[in-house]
């Protein structure tokens, strides 16, 4: 997800997005542990998306 798209969202929407990303990250980690994940790059993408959302939440909290 692009940072520009995330900046347009409200704090509630960002919190919902963060929750969804953390669930997705958990599911991907479980797939890695069981040897089912073929696309390992998805872990990196989700981890960075989580960081983007958290950064924006901190920016909005400080403003």
Curated annotation (Swiss-Prot):
GO terms, molecular function: structural constituent of ribosome
Keyword terms of this UniProt record: Ribonucleoprotein, Ribosomal protein
Listed InterPro entries: Ribosomal_protein_uL29 (IPR050063), Ribosomal_uL29 (IPR001854), Ribosomal_uL29_CS (IPR018254), Ribosomal_uL29_sf (IPR036049)
GO cellular component: cytosolic large ribosomal subunit
Pfam families from the UniProt entry: Ribosomal_L29 (PF00831)
Key word Ribonucleoprotein present: yes
Domain of life (superkingdom): Bacteria
GO biological process, one term: translation
Record has Ribosomal protein as a keyword: yes
HAMAP family membership: Ribosomal_uL29 (MF_00374)
PANTHER family per the UniProt record, alphabetical: 60S RIBOSOMAL PROTEIN L35/50S RIBOSOMAL PROTEIN L29, LARGE RIBOSOMAL SUBUNIT PROTEIN UL29C
Name assigned to this protein: Large ribosomal subunit protein uL29
Source organism: Shigella dysenteriae serotype 1 (strain Sd197)
Lineage: Bacteria, Pseudomonadati, Pseudomonadota, Gammaproteobacteria, Enterobacterales
């Amino acid at each position: 997800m692009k940072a520009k798209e995330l900046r347009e969202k409200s704090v509630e929407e960002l919190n919902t997005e963060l929750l969804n990303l953390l669930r997705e990250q958990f599911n991907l980690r479980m797939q890695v542990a069981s040897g089912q994940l073929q696309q390992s790059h998805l872990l990196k993408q989700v981890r960075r998306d989580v960081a983007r959302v958290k950064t924006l939440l901190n920016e909005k909290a400080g403003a």
